[in-house]
Structures are given as C-alpha cells and as structure tokens.
Amino acid sequence: MKDLLKFLKQQSKTEEFDGIKIGLASPDLIRSWSFGEVKKPETINYRTFKPEREGLFCARIFGPVKDYECLCGKYKRLKHRGVICEKCGVEVTQTKVRRERMGHIDLASPVAHIWFLKSLPSRIGLMLDMTLRDIERVLYFESFVVIEPGMTSLERGQMLTEENYLDALEEYGDEFDAKMGAEAVLELLRAIDLEKEIEMMREELPSINSETRRKKVTKRLKLVEAFFTSGNKPEWMILKVLPVLPPDLRPLVPLDGGRFATSDLNDLYRRVINRNNRLKRLLDLAAPDIIVRNEKRMLQESVDALLDNGRRGRAITGSNKRPLKSLADMIKGKQGRFRQNLLGKRVDYSGRSVITVGPTLRLHQCGLPKKMALELFKPFIYGKLEGRGLATTIKAAKKMVEREVPEVWDVLDDVIREHPVMLNRAPTLHRLGIQAFEPVLIEGKAIQLHPLVCAAYNADFDGDQMAVHVPLTLEAQLEARSLMMSTNNILSPANGEPVITPSQDVVLGLYYTSRERINGKGEGMAFSDVAEAEKAYRTGVAELHARVKVRITETATNEAGEKVKTRRIVDTTVGRALLSQILPKGLSYDLVNQNMGKKQISKLLNTCYRQLGLKDTVIFADQLMYTGFHFATISGASVGIDDMVIPDEKYTLVADAEAEVLEIQEQFQSGLVTAGERYNKVIDIWASANEKVSKAMMANLSKETVINRDGEEEQQESFNSIYMMADSGARGSAAQIRQLAGMRGLMAKPDGSIIETPIVANFREGLNVSQYFISTHGARKGLADTALKTANSGYLTRRLVDVAQDLVVIEDDCGTFEGLTMKPLIEGGDVVEPLRERVLGRVVAQDVFKPGTAEVLVPRNTLLDEAWCDIIEDNSIDEMIVRSVISCDTDFGVCKFCYGRDLARGHIINQGEAIGVVAAQSIGEPGTQLTMRTFHIGGAASRASAENNVQVKNSGTLKLHNAKFVTNSNGKLVIVSRSSELAIIDELGREKERYKVPYGTVLEKLEDDGVAAGEIIAKWDPHTHPIITEVAGSIKFVDMIEGVTMTRQTDELTGLSSIVVLEVGQRPTAGKEMRPMIRLVAADGSDLMIPGTEVPAQYFLPGHAIVNLDDNAPINVGDALARIPQESSKTRDITGGLPRVADLFEARKPKEPAILAEVSGTISFGKETKGKRRLVITPADGGEHYEEMIPKWRNLNVFEGEKVERGEVIADGAEAAHDILRLRGIHNVANYIVNEVQDVYRLQGVKINDKHIEVIIRQMLRKCEIVDAGDSEFLPGEQAEVSRVKIANRELEAQGKQPATFERELLGITKASLATESFISAASFQETTRVLTEAAVGGKSDKLRGLKENVIVGRLIPAGTGYSYHQKRAEAAAKPAVTEATSISASEAEQNLADLLNLAGSND
C-alpha cells in the first residue's frame, strides 16, 4: 500500500515553472489541444442522462463520465486503464480528465476575435491602419474591402459599398479582388510583412512634424514590433478554429423534475454550433450570396457573444431576460475567476459566532465554545482517541464524538492545549484583523474576546460576529504562535504605538483610582510602604482619593546594567499607591503619580515596552485591565440628568450674540455690508458665542468648591461623572458635552452650507420642533455619507494594496547617499510634529554635525532610536537628511536601511517583509474608520471662526519668510506678497512657531524685533481681500464707466458712495473688452512706477471689487485701493478628507491648478488675446524665453519686471503634483504628497508614519519617460520602468556606450497598478479585458515577482516566511542541475501503479 501512495504522489506533482506566458493561439495550436471536434449542439440525453455522441458533452472527446468505466459499460475497473472501448470509443481513465480535455469547432467561415477588434485601441484597426467603423462594416457584411487591386486605380484596403463594387466589377472585370467578412480581414492581415512595416515606420518617424500623426505612428510601431518580437502572427487575431472548454468547467446538472441547471456557456456554444452547421449546409447547397452572408454575420455575432457578451450590440439574453455570462465575464469583476476564486478562497476548519466580553481572560487567550471546538478539532480528536486506544477505528471514534462521551472532553482539552486558533473579524482592514489566540473552552455559544484586542479588530459587542480558523500543520501553528499571537502584536504597524491600550471602562476605572480629593478621609497620613497604604484602604481608614505620603521602592538599571534599588517618600494618593503595585519593576513611580487619562496610560504602556520589553508589557497590560474594571465597578460612575450642569452665563452670552447679530442685520439693511459679508459675520458671531458657552460650561463642570482641612474653601477638579468620562478619554468629548449642557450650535444644511440661525437649546433643555427639524438634516446627511464613504474607502484600500503589493525588503543596504531632508512640521504657529517624531526609527543618510562645529554627532547609517533622538533634541538640530524608500537604489524592492525600523516590532526591518502591503493597510484602514465616524457629533457644524490675527505663544525674535512689504504712513509694515510666512525664533536659533499671513496683513512689529508671548503681532480682515498700493500719489480711473464696467452704490445712512466693479458677464457689450483699473499718477500727472521696476503702478480690478475712493483722490503707501469680498466657506469634515487623499494618490490635476514658473527669469506681459493674458518669462542667461497664456480672471502673484525662480507660484491655486515633480524634483513632490495626506489624517487625530505614504509614492514614481534613448533599445517618448532603464544603463556604461536619459513620471495609483510588469496582477485588478488583450498581443511573460501573482498561481508569496523558499528556488535555478538518480516519468509511474493494482485486484 505504501508504494501505491508513493506512486499517487509522484503522479500529482506538477512541473515546476518560473513564469507564465500569454499569447495568441494559432489554429494549429488549438487543434493540437483538442481531443476531437464537437459537431452537434446536443448536450445529454434527457432520459438516460448519458452524453450525446459528438455533442458538447461527448464522452469520446472529453473522457468517461465515471472513473475507469466506459460509456457502454463494457470495460469497468482499474485493470482496463488506458483501453479505448471499441463499441463506444471512450478511453477508460479517471473522470477528472473531463476538466482538462478540450474540444474544438471548425468554423465554416473565419471569425474576428472581438477582443482584438473592440477592446480599445482596436488592435486589428491599428494593424491595418483602418478605422474601427470601416472594419466593422466589412466584418458585419455591410461593405466590401479591396484585397488585391491588381492593375486597377483602386487601392488596397479601400472600402467599397455594394453599388461601388458592382460598378468596379463592370469596369475592371476580375482584374481586382474585393471581399467582405472576416475572410477579407484575414487576407489583409496575412499580407502584412512585419519586418518591412517596422523598417518603413522607423525611417518615417524622424521626418513627421505633426504631433498627433507621430503619436499614431509610434503606437502602431509599438504594436507591430510587439507582434514581431513575440512571434505572434497578425492573422491569428481572426479565428478559424474555436476551442471548446472542457465540459466539467461548464457543468450541466439534472435537477429533480426533469429540468436542468446549466452554465450559460453551453447555451452560447450551442448557438455557435447551430449557426456553424447551418452555414456548412448552406455552402454545400451553394445558396444565394445574401443568405450565406446573413448566416456568416450571425456566426460572427454568436462567437462574439461567446467570447464577450454585450461588448458589441445588445447582449444575448437567456430565457429569463438576463444577459448570458460569457467567457470574458467569467474572469473579470468581483465575481470573476480572479477575485472570487484565486485571490479569495473559502477555508475549511473554520467556524463563526457572535462575540462577547472575556474580562477574565489573559491577553493571549480567547474563549471558544465547547461545541465549536469539538467540531473544529474533530480529526485531532479522532487521532487522539485511537492513539490512546479508546477507540479501535475511526468509525468508532466518530460514534464516541457524536455521543459526546465524557472521555471526549478530556481528549479535547488535551488536543487544544497550546494549539493556537486564529480569530478574524470582517472587514479585515489591516493585518491586526486576524490574530492568533490560545483557546480556553467555555460553556455557551459565543466566542469570548479579550477586551484589549477590540481596538485592533475595531470590534464591539453589539452583535459583531467573528470567524475562527484552525492552523493545521505544525509550520502553520508555529507561524501563528510566533508571528500572529496577540501578545506579539502590541504595537500598531501604522505608527509604532501600542494598539492594545485600554479604553472606555478600564480608562475610567484607572482615572478614578488616580484622582485626588481634597480633605478625603485619611488625608495627611504617612505610610511606610505601599502594603500599609493598601491595608488602610481595605480597613476603611483612608479612602481611595486621600492625599497621603508613602515611602516607595524603585528599581532602576544603571549604566553598567545592574539593577539598583532606591527608596524615597512621595506625596501621592492611596489609589495611586495601589496602582503602583501592578507597575512592573524598573518603571518610575512618577508614571502613575498623575491623573491617568487615556493618553497617560498609552504613554505608560509605550514606555514599558521600550524599557522592559514585550513580556513585562503583556503581563502589565492585563493587570491594568483587571484593575481598571475593578475600580470602575467600585466607582459607581453613572450618568444622571443633573450631571449636565447648564452654566448661568449661557443666557447672557446668547443674548449678547443676538444683539450683535441684530446690529449686523441693521448694517446690512442700510447697505454697509454685503449679503455675503453679513452671512459670514453672523456665523462668526455664533461660532464664537458657542465657544464661549462651551468654555463657561466646561469651567463650571470641571471644578467644584470644597472645604479643606483648614476649613477654607478651595477649588478642586470635579467628580462629576460626565466630566470624568470626557476628561479621562473614556467616552465622549467636549463637543458632545457642549451639546448636552451648553448649546447645540450651528447646523449644516444637506448641501454642506451652514444655517445661520443656530440651535441655542441643548439636549437637557430639549429642542422645539423647528430646532429638532434643523438638526435632522445633519444627522441624516451623516448617515448617508457613512454608507457611501465606506465603499469609497474600501476601494481606496484596494487600489493602494494593488499598487504596492510587490514591494518587499530584499537587501541589506543599497548604499545610496540620498534621502529626504526632514524638518519639524510647523502649522498654524504650533509645532505639529517635532523633528524627533519624524526621524525616529529612520536611518541617517549623511553625517550630522554638531551645530557650529565639524564634529560628527550622528554618523551615517545610524538607526535613530529613542536614545539617539534625545541626543538630537539636546543639540537642537532642526534639520537632517534621512534615508527614504523614495530614494532607495534597490531594483525590484527596497533595502533595510532605506526603510529603517519595523514599526510593529521596534527593531530594523527584516528581509522579506512585505512593506508595500503594510503601508497600504496602514493608510487604508483609518480611511475606513474615518468614513464611519462622521455623524457622531450629530452633524453639528464645526467651523473654525475665521482667523484675523496672529497672537504669538512664545517669546523670541520675529523673522519673515519670502515676504514683500511696504511701510505705510503709520510706519507699520503691510504685506504685499501672497505666500508669506512669519516665524518666531528663540535665542538658540530654533524655530518655535510659524504662521502663514495673507496679502494685506498689517504687522505691529518690524523684522528682527523681539516679541513677547501673547502679543498680537499681525492683523487682517478675513472677509475681504484688499488691493494695496505700493506707491503714494493720486488715483486715476481707467475704463471705469458707470453703467458699463461699474455701478455706484450710495449708503443711505452715511451718504458715502462706493463703486462696485461688474463681472464681465454682467456688463453690456460695450464693456466686455474693457479692463477697469486704477493707475497712480504723480502731482504733475505723470505715471508712477512700482519701486525698483520700470512697471507703471496700475492695479486691475476684478469683478465684485468695491472702491471707496473717488477719481483723483490722494492716497498713501500701504493703503487699500479696493476690497474684494470673500465668499463663505463650507464645513470641513473627512468628506473633504477621503476624496482628497484619493485625489492625491491618483495624482489628479486640480480644477484650477496653481501656475508655476517653468523657467527662472524675469516676468513681462505680452500681447493680450480675448480673455487671456500672455505671460512671458525671459531667462537671465538669455536663453529661449517661455510664454504661457493665462486666463484674465486668474489672480497673479507677480508683477511685470519681477524675477521668479523655476517652480515658484505665479498664480494661486492648488498645486498639481505633476508640476511639482517636473519643476522642483522628486524630493519636493514627495514632501508635498506626504504633508497633504498627513494633513487630512491629522485633522481626524489619526497617526500614520510618513514611511507608509513614501512607500506608495515610490510605487507612483516607478515609471519614467525616455528623453534620449542613447545606445539603448528604448524609443524616445516611451514609458518604461525606472529599474529597467537603470539596469540597462548600467550595462551600457559598462560597455562604454551612451546611456539613456529619462524624466521621472508620476502616475496615479490606478494607472500605476495597471502599468506593472506583471499582467496577471494588472488583470486581476481592473480592466481585465484590456490588460489581457495587450499582454497576449505582446506575448508577455509574467515572471511572478510580486505577491499577487504568486497567490494566483497558488504558491507561497515571496515575502515573510515564503521569502526563503523563493530565495532557495532562485539559488537552485542559478546552479547547474544535478542529474537526479532514477527519475521516473509520469507514464512509467502510472504503468507501475496499474500493475500493482491489478495484482491487488486478482487477489480479492
């Protein structure tokens, strides 16, 4: 029997392969696959259920229906293996050959393959250089095409209608040849000489002038070359023989009641065969042309439907009016072969159930219902029962398990011990969505989950379900235990912070324990150690919050690595002393000697992990959880209506705001402010009123007055339950409490604009009908958004995974000196991210020197850990160059040094780590979370009240960055440049804060002045945009004609008149071409120039501009000539966020992108055209000047005669990533995308490490455009993989030839995924038809380099534990093959097996 098994194993071993090639099948190849021709459309006999002969299920062609048994039953059993029955002609073999044997249909007339015809760009069309319309007319028999013009005036490929053809026949007789249908196209394709075509086009290319024509020729050249190099012949795009799928892949199953369930393919094949047979008969009968033509057209259409139903014309429908599923539909889409069966499979040994809390479990455990465990571990139990001799056979064991005899439970306990199971919660958004636990058997039917891992799973216990999977093999168990165990996944791979931090009840319990209460029972006592404090608490002498003195013992590790104990007395509370009991040895008492909110607990765990390692942290986390639950129970915190204390100041604040609004309303009615300004100001008033109310409310809630020991009144932090929940971070936020006890505030309409009347009531007071109605808008919008955005976010994740899936760490060090320059991130004045956080876990690219010296502080290639970061901070270094995956030089992967620290493990990354997938998950996972978290604040509009000044937080010196300014009559600076920033520098020269200041800002201080903290140093009006003059003089109106380009509005109250410029659209025809502007003139009427230039001082006025001065009025420097009202802003919420991230990663061009200077030089304006200005930049070195047409309505940041640098902003707008890459280089575009993406996530309080975004950017930058081909094979203007070009260039340089030059190109993630080298990966992502068509024509072969391709072909992935397997295979392939001893062929094995079995058979 053993031998027998050996043979079976040998038989099933597939041949090893290194790649998969796709190409066009020639008719001969199709025939060689085939085991016979299918001639009849019959399937199976409805009475006998036997397949019909020569039909679609014929046993003779495709193989027997039953194992080792022919159709008529003459030969049965294994001993007749390989015999072909002389009666029914069926070979006696296994029935599984019906899954692999193909048939064929000989078509009576050739048929075009619809993919090469209709999938754009049409390959047949490109090949013949004809339009798709024309080819279709030929194929569907509407017109003739000339094939052989002979000596006539016709041309090859010319289209002739029926009449033209008859005329030509009369004129030329049979001198020429014209046909219609696929035969004609076949002959045209056959006549193409590929080599000659390539030569002709290569010669023609340099002389072509028109851009479109050149593009077309290049396209065609690429196609013809692809055919030539791949060895495909163009005529193979036309089918003469149609392959027939093996019958078991298009099954037909009899249902009861004489009906059949069948695959749609059978219908489609039947149609083809019927029409084909009819056509054959018609041809034999020599039927009239018109009938034959119609039949041929129908044959063409039926083959089209079989290959890709619905691509041309109406889809063929089945009996139930739904389109039939064609071969193309089988492989594409979510339900297609790729995504349904190859990339996602169903797994056995799994179960699912509802989850509940397991507060008593350890971190590495989960509670598994006994019933489930019994089912999941059945085979193990059977084996154990037999092994122990409790059951003699498997059958007996089965019976025992079914009866659930007591021994079975003992065996189950034994089987389960140390056998991890994997728990998974859908949706699995990141790798922490599947973790391994040791099962603990429990009664009941719900799986128990440890509370601390809920955050990673994003699970809650409101009915969530989870699936259990059992790793079977020893290797699988080992991997589950060492890599996936929940205790090994304490840090999040997205940001390297603990992911098992306590939340909710636990936080509340710990917070409650660590609070102090003035004059609590036992205040002022002193204890000799923590145990004594505990005794006092247990006996009721001192309460939990009493302030006491305790002597504590701390353990610390000194430099020599010895443990040193120190004792000291601390002022603390009884509760904190109790907490210190569970603190692991080696952590400082100060970590718990504070109010333990969620942030503090997270920091505590992080410190514990970094200082003491994994094991201690896991034990500590569990202890924290048990303690937290215990004290949360004891605290008795609850929510009552009286806890929501409404502040007394609320009513006066609301009344004040209402008065202000009335005042503005009056101003509006008297025409002092415009409607837009009024709306904005009203909303600002209410926003700030809301802020004040909520401040008052929080102040009221957070403090309470108590009597201390000396009998005096004292303020202490309140023990109000709601305040404690919010303050500790357990549940709720200030915004939510504001709605409960303050005022609900401003609401948004469904379109996102803010309703100007706020809800002044709160939930405690209750809402009246109108208030309730307004608030339903926001709530409903939130819910609708959530549903839509979850889908969007999932799609974003899928695209990210797809673009990054093949990026793996494959070498130690690529040796590059390049990297990204890191600086602290400063935004809105605050340091959002200090340098240490940005460089932590990175590798230094170039030596960092001590400031002001030549001493090397941090040498190159140092991995910066916490200790190094402290050194960097102490030396106040504010920028350094660190290695990044974007600048990594490794081909087809990245190196360890460029990636740096593995965030989830805390040491440098290992080889074989799939960093691409981790990056995609880290970015995609919060996306989904964010999308699901819009509506929790009930749609309350959170809009920052518009900023109108800069108030500094630190003292220091004022510095201005790229700012132009003028000094006004009061001696103050007025900013007249667009993207100016002011920074505060401390005495060490470190930047402390940085602010963007808009055009028109008035500064209270001069540059290099000292400023004190809290000073307001800059002011501006946020609602209007001024136009400021840079010279003094009197003003002169140009093109300002009342009723034509402007109107006068007089204020009834003040009698002042103001001038409003009309939009171009509102002007009468006379004013369309006019350009209203203000020119400044000197006293003598001569034009004034802008200082330092030869440009006259004239200011164009855009539409809606309001001028408050009259013609010839005098004006000073720095005064406003006009003001332009700004529109109101919509609410910002992640809705803007998620699409924003998608836009960045898709590298989409914004609607009105910023215009950047293409070259460095001097600005001037050329001749104007209708609606556009001509901007000219003349380089200083006298090179070619650059011109650009800019629409007149764009606000320019530059004036005539100014100097600009390449890549500087000329006109404001959103910057397009492609422009940044082209003009400022890779590092700038990387910084731009990283910062923009981070802004969106930071707004939501989500932390993601920059590395992950950089990984995606690296994948977006993998392609380049060849500028000059040098001596390489590439074509100029061709897109190629950067790594390919680099490898080719290295070879060329080694031979002393000219390398190719290239420009990097930025592709969006979808485009980048589709442009990968691997066609399998691209086809399984999107646009399957197009990808496969392109790959087949080029005869591409897939080297199976990425993860996805390997999953699809069913191999281990070349990452993680599968990495070494692929390494070994590569090494084996590199060595010459050693001849194997007595290798045995499959046929020999089969023969031996048959002999063995015959022997066995003759004995019984």
UniProtKB/Swiss-Prot annotation:
Keyword Iron-sulfur tagged: no
Record-level GO cellular component terms: DNA-directed RNA polymerase complex
Keywords, sorted A to Z: DNA-directed RNA polymerase, Magnesium, Metal-binding, Nucleotidyltransferase, Transcription, Transferase, Zinc
MF (Gene Ontology): DNA binding; DNA-directed RNA polymerase activity; magnesium ion binding; zinc ion binding
CDD domains on file: RNAP_beta'_C, RNAP_beta'_N
Role description: DNA-dependent RNA polymerase catalyzes the transcription of DNA into RNA using the four ribonucleoside triphosphates as substrates.
Annotated binding of Zn(2+) 1, by residue: C70, C72, C85, C88
Gene Ontology annotations of biological process type: DNA-templated transcription
Catalyses which reaction(s): RNA(n) + a ribonucleoside 5'-triphosphate = RNA(n+1) + diphosphate
Subunit and partners: The RNAP catalytic core consists of 2 alpha, 1 beta, 1 beta' and 1 omega subunit. When a sigma factor is associated with the core the holoenzyme is formed, which can initiate transcription.
Cofactor: Mg(2+); Zn(2+)
UniProt EC number: 2.7.7.6
Upper classification of the organism: Bacteria, Pseudomonadati, Pseudomonadota, Gammaproteobacteria, Alteromonadales
Annotated binding of Mg(2+), by residue: D460, D462, D464
Stated family: Belongs to the RNA polymerase beta' chain family.
Keyword Nucleotidyltransferase: yes
Binding site for Zn(2+) 2: C814, C888, C895, C898
SMART domains reported in the protein's UniProt record: RPOLA_N (SM00663)
The name this protein goes by in its record: DNA-directed RNA polymerase subunit beta'
